[in-house]
Regions:
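Long, histidine/aromatic-enriched segments associated with O2/redox biology
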Residues: 1-295
């Protein structure tokens, strides 16, 4: 997981969600999957490949290490009316990223082979980096991420070396988005489209994405580590494969509650009205490699 977190600018990602069918085979499969990762890392050392194996509450709470993650729960739906974050909880998340698509794909094939019939894959999404690290909305993405190894690891990892993970897919309606002026798009984000400069709080709209997601509690920022990437096809569904890591699930959930209007002011994120629709959502816990080998 450290390689996932510390590679801040990975060019490609694969996100696989599955349900567990044979729980008694998972520990051995995890060990073999870690061996697959080590082999690919040795073969392609220049590509900075990393992998996370993370588990939903239904499986994780049956293990001897459940106490490591007291906040873990199944993803509930958030929001109301037409602004909903649907719950599509699964048992296993496999997150692979690197600077080379072939390395990712090779590792994904190897890992799925070792899990075999023990899992039932429900979704596989392939992400890619765009120019200047912009999303399909043409705004720079991930600016609020912590930077530098120390800040990244302290934000993402708990005292056990594990991390809470949020996996969502947001489908973008680019035709709708392009009908808004640049000024309206910037109002939606809270930043300049060209320069990525953050708007001052005095002029920032309370429904801007920055206002809804850049949160503080008792003066302390509720930071998360994002490793999201655009995904999809030009002719079909496309959007953002959103994945976030945090030492506390609370940090992740607070952002969702503010984006989807589940807080006192009831305001929702402009992006959910003007650009994006959440089409999936799941919480997972990613244990350390040492814990994975002892499941």
């Amino acid at each position: 997981m450290d390689n996932i977190l510390l590679n801040e600018h990975a060019q490609f990602g694969i996100f696989i969600e599955a349900d567990i069918k044979q729980a008694n085979q998972i520990q051995a499969a995890c060990v073999k999957a870690l061996d697959c990762l080590a082999a690919i890392q040795a073969k392609f050392p220049q590509h900075q490949i990393g992998m996370t194996l993370a588990f939903g509450a239904n499986f994780w709470q049956s293990t001897q290490y459940a106490a490591q993650s007291p906040e873990l729960k199944n993803f509930p739906s958030y929001g109301k009316n037409h602004t909903i974050a649907p719950a599509t909880q699964h048992d296993l998340l496999i997150h692979i990223q690197s600077n080379n698509y072939d390395a990712n794909f090779t590792l994904a094939l190897d890992v799925l082979a070792v899990f075999g019939s023990a899992i039932d894959v429900k979704n596989e999404t392939h992400g890619f980096r765009r120019y200047e690290e912009r999303g399909l909305d043409d705004f720079v993405d991930g600016t609020e991420n912590p930077h530098g190894d120390e800040k990244i690891l302290s934000t993402a990892l708990d005292e056990h070396g594990g991390s809470y993970v949020l996996m969502q897919r947001f489908a973008h309606d680019l035709s709708k988005w392009q009908q808004y002026s640049v000024a309206e798009q910037e109002e939606s984000i809270g930043r300049s489209k060209e320069t990525n400069e953050e708007f001052d709080k005095a002029i920032r709209h309370p429904r801007s994405h920055l206002a809804r997601s850049n949160l503080k509690e008792n003066g302390v920022g509720l930071k998360i580590v994002r490793r999201s990437l655009p995904y999809g096809t030009a002719s079909g569904e496309h959007g953002l494969a959103f994945i976030a890591y945090a030492a506390r699930l609370h940090n992740i959930e607070a952002q969702l509650q503010h984006m989807f209007g589940d807080v006192e002011d009831g305001l929702t994120d402009f992006l959910l009205e003007r650009l994006s629709q959440a089409i999936s959502g799941a919480y997972y816990y990613a244990p350390s490699k040492e814990t994975l080998r002892r499941l």
